[in-house]
Amino acid sequence: MLTTLAFDVYGTLIDTQGVVSLLSSYLGDDKAQEFSSRWRDKQLEYSFRRGLMQQYEDFAVCTKDALLFTNNELGDGLTAPQQEELLEKYRSLPAFDDAKTALSKLNSAGIECFAFSNGSADAVTELLEGAELNRYFKDIVSCKDIKSFKPNPQVYQHFLDKSSSKEQNTWLISSNSFDIIGASAAGWKTAWVKRSREAQFDPWGINPTITVSSLSQLIENIK
C-alpha cells in the first residue's frame, strides 16, 4: 500500500517564531523571543485544556486568548491594535527553509502528503498558500472537523478515515513531541523533527520511529 505522510503544520512546516521580528519592533529584541515562546506555549496549553474539558473553540480562539494572557502576564506591553496586527501576522507565517524542497522530493517519489493540523482548514489553506506549499498536499485534515485537538486519539483516527490510510502505512511528521507520542500511541509510524539542539523529547518511554534535524532527511528515511 501507499505510504501516507501526515504533516503537522504549526512548528513543523510553518515557523511560529515568524512573529519575533514584529514583536521586536514593539517590545525590543530582549523581550520579543520570550513573548513569542510564552505565547506559543500558552496556545498549546489552551488547546489541551479545551480538548480535555470538551469545551471546543477554534484554534484561532486559543491563539487569541493566549496572546491576551501573555500580554497581561508580561506587563501589558502591547496595545490592542498591535495585538490585532500580530494575529494578522499569525495568518501568514513563513515556512521553514527546508519545507518546499523536501515536499517536492517526496511528491516526486510518489508519497502522498497531507497537512494535518489543529488549525481550521481555511486557516491552514491560507498559511500554505502564502508559503507556496499548498500544491504539495493531496488534502488538509483539520482536527476542527471533530471539534477536538491533538493528541486526542480520535483526531488520529479521523485522519485515517479521511485519508483512507492504515496505521501501519501512515507517518506523522512533527516537531511537537506531544503530537509524536499521540500518533505513536495510535499505532502510527512517526518522524520527530528536532529543529534545535535544545529541543527535548518527553521521557514517556514512547519514542519516535525516526528523528531528523531537517525535513530534507525524510526522503532517505521514510519507507
Could you tell me what each predicted segment is?
Residues 1-41:
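Active-site neighborhood of HAD-like aspartate-dependent phosphohydrolases
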Residues 47-84:
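A metal-dependent, Asp-based hydrolase signature
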Residues 1-5, 104, 120-121, 125-223:
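Asp-based, Mg2+/Mn2+-dependent phosphohydrolase catalytic module
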Residues 81-94, 99-130, 137-143:
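Substrate-recognition element of Asp-dependent hydrolases with the DxDx(T/V) motif
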Residues 27-32, 73-78, 108, 132-136, ...:
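Short helix-capping segments at alpha-helix termini
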Residues 21-22, 38, 65-69, 85, ...:
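Alpha-helical elements of Rossmann-like donor-binding domains used by nucleotide-donor carbohydrate transfer enzymes
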Residues 32-40, 79-88:
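Short, well-structured alpha-helical segments
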